[in-house]
Amino acid sequence: MSKGVEIFYKGQKAFLNILSLWPQIERRWRIIHQVNYVHVIVFWVLLFDLLLVLHVMANLSYMSEVVKAIFILATSAGHTTKLLSIKANNVQMEELFRRLDNEEFRPRGANEELIFAAACERSRKLRDFYGALSFAALSMILIPQFALDWSHLPLKTYNPLGENTGSPAYWLLYCYQCLALSVSCITNIGFDSLCSSLFIFLKCQLDILAVRLDKIGRLITTSGGTVEQQLKENIRYHMTIVELSKTVERLLCKPISVQIFCSVLVLTANFYAIAVLSDERLELFKYVTYQACMLIQIFILCYYAGEVTQRSLDLPHELYKTSWVDWDYRSRRIALLFMQRLHSTLRIRTLNPSLGFDLMLFSSIVNCSYSYFALLKRVNS
């Protein structure tokens, strides 16, 4: 496996393997990881979801309490979906990672090497930036709460152990909330940066295809082949990129779509909380921090998926810029068919096939969340 290709997923795999999401070869490790996965999903994920649901149901008549819980509940629902989705498709994900190192996706020549190296560096920086940002947001939510007012739990959840501040039961629930939120943070870092890295890889392949299209007809040599041979080779390469894009979409669209839906709930609840709880400085600080992190999370997913679509839109122009007027009739006919196919742009679609992940979707999410917030505030007043 090429070390360059591993940059797109190796760090994220290691991060997610803390939660035992990947298949194991040895029987002993399979048993250990299965036990750890059941422990994580039942105790740290589903139980946490249940406590949040019970708290919301017990406080339906108190809008402020519902809002304080709903933004964490929606986040937890999104990260639960990600965990279950990765575990259910872990074998297919492993096959996808191996496929990235196929000969057909490897760069040829200095220009392509530079494009691939830039994509690797971009993926690494994104992973590190997003991880640092997420841990910083987690720290800003938990540490000020403990330092300034540890008499209140970090999160609003159902408390079956009583409200006796300072008791062992209280600190047990306090630590449980902190660790459960950390599990959610780890999942989001691994999954979101993995999705973005795969989108960067797809965009990198489209950039390489554009370079190869530009070279068609320029080097008619024994090694370079005729124009017709070069066209056929690029058509096959484009077909492999399309197949890879469909595989990525099939594996990722469901959890990302659920994340988008949950994000609308989170943003709406946070808009409302920021407007209503402006007098409670510590609570306001937590909501503003979380709101910023959530917006960046959605932006990253939509932006890098949108880059794939945007680069795909440029490919017909790249083919048209070649010296096709000097080619023979058969080559021009193949080029015309190829150009017609290139007009079918690549899109990473949501569960609704009419929508793709792009900046337009990001704008719609923010506008929709603010509209729901305005409606909620009007109804509540």
Swiss-Prot record:
InterPro entries: 7tm6_olfct_rcpt. GO terms for molecular function: odorant binding; olfactory receptor activity. Its main location: membrane. Glycans are attached at residue 59. The chain crosses the membrane at residues 38-58, 66-86, 128-148, 171-191, 256-276, 288-308, 356-376. GO terms for cellular component: dendrite membrane; membrane; plasma membrane. Pfam families: 7tm_6. Residues 59-65, 149-170, 277-287, 377-381 are extracellular. It is a multi-pass membrane protein. Keywords: Cell membrane, Glycoprotein, Membrane, Olfaction, Receptor, Sensory transduction, Transducer, Transmembrane, Transmembrane helix. Residues 1-37, 87-127, 192-255, 309-355 are cytoplasmic. Interacts with Orco. Complexes exist early in the endomembrane system in olfactory sensory neurons (OSNs), coupling these complexes to the conserved ciliary trafficking pathway. PANTHER family: ODORANT RECEPTOR (PTHR21137), ODORANT RECEPTOR 46A, ISOFORM B-RELATED (PTHR21137:SF37). Belongs to the insect chemoreceptor superfamily. Heteromeric odorant receptor channel (TC 1.A.69) family. Or2a subfamily. This is Odorant receptor 46a, isoform A.
